[in-house]
């Protein structure tokens, strides 16, 4: 019998706990340290601080750790405004001044693009808004504690399934906090609170919409409690069981954009959660594309027309492409509602070959795309053949932005402008817009 030699596993010589100095801040709000030549990312640590860390995970090129004790605190460290910040899994970075958060995000974005294109990029001022009270949508988990006979409403604890019960959230709009503060008293009166799933609140421009998700069937008494609450608080009320979602009170929610545009949506639909920055982002996009009356513009991953309809007010024709059929129908309805007659919407899977689609052969001279976190690699490889003079890319993931930018650079496009958008202060999310121009 042949015995195979198995070398012993390499023993990690690093201590599980150690003292380190934090050298920098990454865009997700993690402190950066060097240990034995390797980069480590440390939770709850600021540049200039000395901290005792606990190793969480070590990988080949980097490691992850958490701060166990702050030995020397930075003068810039601040007390979180939110009383739940140390436990809630929502905002991770309230201990960091918002200006420092933004600078770290902007630096990371610019540095990544400079590696691809060292010259010729115009770095635009960051697009920012309010640091608190900016979210117009919130989703709340619910759990009934049978032993304590108590209903918990709030957010999942960080790295846990436990719920942090909250009465107020510092990053949501005031109109949502007004409703949030009354939910525990309302829902604790339900006959079967253990059947409650979650609640979504959305601050539309015509009032607050509320969705209650539950299993089983609501009793007439529980339904009456909800309806009375909706009438009293002037809510648009939606109920969702295991089979369907229905609106039982109020008008359909909508949000407004410039040029008297009004976009109607369902409470489950994706909309940008930061209303102010959504408008500023649209304004910047149209300005950078330098849209003119003779332009033919293609908008990919268009949703219900968030960019397409504002574009249609300024160009000869606009075409929006979306992968979800229901969103395409809502986009068409919004176009009709706003009397936008020079816009068309189509359903297409942009991760599949769309060369034979009727819209794919039109002579678009400008393109806008707002893809999901996975990016738009397949679509861009096909779109480069259209040879549009300008392409504006809205990104929510710097890694896929860089990957997709390389596709465009290899097709004779160059990065013209870029700006960081601080859509989600106190989180590690990095949004941006980048303008690419075709080289003549």
Curated annotation (Swiss-Prot):
Function comment: Catalyzes the formation of 5-methyl-uridine at position 1939 (m5U1939) in 23S rRNA.
Family statement: Belongs to the class I-like SAM-binding methyltransferase superfamily. RNA M5U methyltransferase family. RlmD subfamily.
Catalytic activity reported: uridine(1939) in 23S rRNA + S-adenosyl-L-methionine = 5-methyluridine(1939) in 23S rRNA + S-adenosyl-L-homocysteine + H(+)
EC number from the UniProt entry: 2.1.1.190
Active site (record annotation): 396 (nucleophile)
Keyword 4Fe-4S in annotation: yes
InterPro entries per the UniProt record, alphabetical: 23S_rRNA_MeTrfase_RlmD, MeTrfase_TrmA_AS, MeTrfase_TrmA_CS, NA-bd_OB-fold, SAM-dependent_MTases_sf, TRAM_dom, U5_MeTrfase_fam
Source species of the chain: Mannheimia succiniciproducens (strain KCTC 0769BP / MBEL55E)
TRAM domain boundaries: 8-69
Sites where the protein binds [4Fe-4S] cluster: 82, 88, 91, 169
Name of the featured protein: 23S rRNA (uracil(1939)-C(5))-methyltransferase RlmD
Binding site for S-adenosyl-L-methionine: 272, 301, 306, 322, 349, 370
One Pfam family recorded for the sequence: TRAM
Keywords noted in UniProt: 4Fe-4S, Iron, Iron-sulfur, Metal-binding, Methyltransferase, rRNA processing, S-adenosyl-L-methionine, Transferase
């Amino acid at each position: 019998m042949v015995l195979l030699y198995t070398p012993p596993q390499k023993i990690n010589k690093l201590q599980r706990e150690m003292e380190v100095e934090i050298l920098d801040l990454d865009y997700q709000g993690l402190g950066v340290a060097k240990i034995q030549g390797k980069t480590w990312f440390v939770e709850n640590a600021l540049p200039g601080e000395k901290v005792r860390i606990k190793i969480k995970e070590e990988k080949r090129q980097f490691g992850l750790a958490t701060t166990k004790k702050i030995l020397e605190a930075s003068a810039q460290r601040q007390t979180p405004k939110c009383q739940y910040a140390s436990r809630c899994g929502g905002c991770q970075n309230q201990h960091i001044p918002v200006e420092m958060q933004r600078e770290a995000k902007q630096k990371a974005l610019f540095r990544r693009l400079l590696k691809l294109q060292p010259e010729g990029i115009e770095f635009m001022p960051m697009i920012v808004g309010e640091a608190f009270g900016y979210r117009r949508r919130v989703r709340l988990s619910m759990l009934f504690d049978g032993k304590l006979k108590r209903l918990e409403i709030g957010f999942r604890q960080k790295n846990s399934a436990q719920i942090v019960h909250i009465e107020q959230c510092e990053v949501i709009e005031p109109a949502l906090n007004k409703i949030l503060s009354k939910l525990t008293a309302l829902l604790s009166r339900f006959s079967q609170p253990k059947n409650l799933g979650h609640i979504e609140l959305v601050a539309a421009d015509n009032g607050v919409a509320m969705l209650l998700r539950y299993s089983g069937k609501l009793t007439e008494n529980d339904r009456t409690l909800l309806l009375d609450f909706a009438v009293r608080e002037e809510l648009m009320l939606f109920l969702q069981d295991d089979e369907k979602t229905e609106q039982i009170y109020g008008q359909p929610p909508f949000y407004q954009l410039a040029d008297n545009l009004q976009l109607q949506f369902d409470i489950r639909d994706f909309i940008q959660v930061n209303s102010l920055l959504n408008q500023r982002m649209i304004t910047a996009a149209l300005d950078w594309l330098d849209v003119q009356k003779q332009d033919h513009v293609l908008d990919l991953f268009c949703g219900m027309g968030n960019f397409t309809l504002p574009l249609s007010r300024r160009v000869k024709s606009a075409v929006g492409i979306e992968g979800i059929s229901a969103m395409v129908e809502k986009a068409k309805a919004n176009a009709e509602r706003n009397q936008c007659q020079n816009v068309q919407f189509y359903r297409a899977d942009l991760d599949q070959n769309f060369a034979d689609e009727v819209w794919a052969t039109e002579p678009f001279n400008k393109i806008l795309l707002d893809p999901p976190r996975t990016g738009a690699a397949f679509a861009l490889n096909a779109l480069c053949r259209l040879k549009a003079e300008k392409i504006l890319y809205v990104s929510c993931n710097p890694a896929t932005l860089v990957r997709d930018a390389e596709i465009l650079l290899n097709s004779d496009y160059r990065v013209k402008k870029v700006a960081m958008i601080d859509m989600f202060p106190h989180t590690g999310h990095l949004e941006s817009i980048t303008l690419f121009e075709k080289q003549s």
